[in-house]
Structures are given as C-alpha cells and as structure tokens.
C-alpha cells in the first residue's frame, strides 16, 4: 500500500446508466490526497446532456464512491488502501423517501498514479413532480456512514439529506457493500464511523459538474462509562 499510493493521486471516472429510463454517460477526472481524505472531481456528461434530472443523485456515486480518499484516524485499518494493487468493488442501493431508488456498482483499479473508477447506475421510480426530476435540489448535507465487517467484506449504512429549494430535505437511506479484490486476508477494521461532506462548487448547464469531498474515518467520540 505505502509504495503504491502517493499523497497526490489522479482520478479518472467512467459512468453510465439510466434514470427513469433516460440513458446517459459521464466521464471525469480529478485529484486528491488519499491520506488526508480530500479530493476534487470534474465530470462532464458525454451522452444525454443536458441531464433531465438532478446530478445530485449521481454525485455520491462519484465522490462518496471514491473510497480510497478517506483519512483514517485512531489507527483504524484502512480496508480500501490495503486492497491495492488489485483494487476493490462496491454495490449500493439508495432508497429515497419519495419512492425513488438508485442502485450502483463501481469497480476501482489502479494504473500507475491514477485511480480508475467504472460505475454503472440504475435509477427508477423518481416522481415526475419530485425534486430530482424537477431539478430543484441544492446539494447534500454532511452525513455519517456506519461501517462494520461482515464475513470478509465491509458493510456501510447511511442516511443522507438532499437539500431542496423551498422544501424540507429529501431523505434517503444507503446500503453499501465493499469487497476487496485481493485474494489474501486483510486486516479488518472494527465498527466505526466515516464522516463525509460533498460539495458542488461549480456546474454548467446540467452537463458539467465540479465536486469536492472530504471524509474522515473515526471511532465514536463519546466515552464509555467508567467501571
């Protein structure tokens, strides 16, 4: 791990899928520091622009899907960095409280100083009059994922809040499974939390988007009762 990942790494992302039957493709590039847990991405829609839905539902598949860029504190073993050079995959189902569902599969590999992400998504049942299809969302609130091991893989559970103009936030529930492609056993982390913040500093005409994410893995800050 130490010799493969540097303090500055490049990112390339290739995404395709459908949302409510509408097909699209995106490509992007970026950079970040895996050990500080910060990253930037620049993503362009290459097929299907302008998108007829809010890109916000895809941004967690990009930044929040870029699991190598997490600052692990308190000696928490880093499952994702240990997985190189082979890499890892993840699957995620996001269930929105208005009925929308987004499923995603991502493959992470390493080529030189560049992390390669290949993502496939399927979005269904987003209401025509909802904030996603009306494109009135305004980014994500910060959130926290709970992470735990389960028979050699990592599971993640998270509740995210999508900001909506003039309305309460749209809540969604995320269920993620992370799988290393490395054949040998890894040092598994115990139950912990991963705090994350996704921002979109810039976008153009629903066809170009810039993302920033910061993420920190930690144990609970609440002390146990002394015995």
Swiss-Prot record:
UniProt modified residues of type 2,3-didehydrotyrosine: 64
GO annotation, biological process: bioluminescence
Subunit structure: Homotetramer.
Protein name per Swiss-Prot or TrEMBL: GFP-like non-fluorescent chromoprotein
Organism: Condylactis gigantea (Giant Caribbean anemone)
Database matches in InterPro entries: GFP, GFP-related
Pfam family, one: GFP
Alphabetically ordered keywords of this record: Chromophore, Luminescence, Photoprotein
Annotated family: Belongs to the GFP family.
Placement of covalent cross-link 5-imidazolinone (Ala-Gly): 63-65
Biotech exploitation of the protein: Fluorescent proteins have become a useful and ubiquitous tool for making chimeric proteins, where they function as a fluorescent protein tag. Typically they tolerate N- and C-terminal fusion to a broad variety of proteins. They have been expressed in most known cell types and are used as a noninvasive fluorescent marker in living cells and organisms. They enable a wide range of applications where they have functioned as a cell lineage tracer, reporter of gene expression, or as a measure of protein-protein interactions.
PTM note: Contains a chromophore consisting of modified amino acid residues. The chromophore is formed by autocatalytic backbone condensation between Xaa-N and Gly-(N+2), and oxidation of Tyr-(N+1) to didehydrotyrosine. Maturation of the chromophore requires nothing other than molecular oxygen. The precise stereochemistry of the tyrosine has not been determined.
């Amino acid at each position: 791990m130490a010799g493969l990942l540097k303090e500055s790494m490049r990112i390339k992302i290739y995404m395709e899928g459908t949302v409510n039957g509408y097909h699209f493709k995106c490509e992007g590039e970026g950079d970040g520091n895996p050990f500080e847990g910060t990253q930037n991405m620049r993503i362009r829609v290459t097929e299907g622009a302008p998108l007829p839905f809010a890109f916000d539902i895809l941004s967690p598949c990009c930044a929040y899907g870029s699991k190598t860029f997490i600052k692990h504190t308190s000696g928490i073993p880093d499952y994702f960095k240990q997985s190189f050079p082979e890499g890892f995959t993840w699957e995620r189902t996001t269930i929105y409280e208005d009925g929308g569902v987004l499923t995603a599969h991502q493959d992470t590999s390493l080529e030189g100083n560049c992390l390669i992400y290949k993502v496939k998504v399927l979005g269904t049942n987003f209401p025509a009059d909802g904030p996603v299809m009306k494109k009135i969302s305004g980014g994500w609130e910060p959130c926290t994922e709970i992470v735990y091991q389960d028979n050699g893989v990592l599971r993640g559970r998270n509740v995210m809040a999508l900001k909506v103009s003039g309305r309460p936030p749209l809540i969604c529930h995320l269920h993620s499974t992370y799988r290393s492609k490395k054949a040998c056993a890894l040092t598994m982390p115990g139950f912990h939390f991963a705090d994350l913040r996704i921002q979109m500093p810039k976008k153009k005409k629903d066809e170009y988007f810039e993302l920033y994410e910061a993420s920190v893995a930690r144990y609970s800050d609440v002390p146990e009762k002394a015995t």
